[in-house]
Amino acid sequence: MAPLFRFETEAEVIEAANTTIVGLASCFCARDHARIIRVHEGLEYGMVGVNTGLVSTEVAPLGWVKQSGLGREGSRHGIEDYLELKYICTGF
């Protein structure tokens, strides 16, 4: 069971969705590609599903924002959190 809400504008949807203190995942339905991009960019969530539930794969980063925590797991983005990046410049 999931609650459904009706909104008049995209701005209302984004504002209502972003009022939560956590930001692990969100899903929404839309047909228009430009609308999908606008809403996705406005949402403060680590993962966003469009017209589907979220499917986890080894190439998809699992991430959090807000009080869900910070960081990424999975994919190269998650691996990079565990690496120490160094730069070296040598001349011979």
Predicted segments — roles?
Residues 1-92:
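Conserved C-terminal structural/oligomerization subdomain of aldehyde/semialdehyde dehydrogenase
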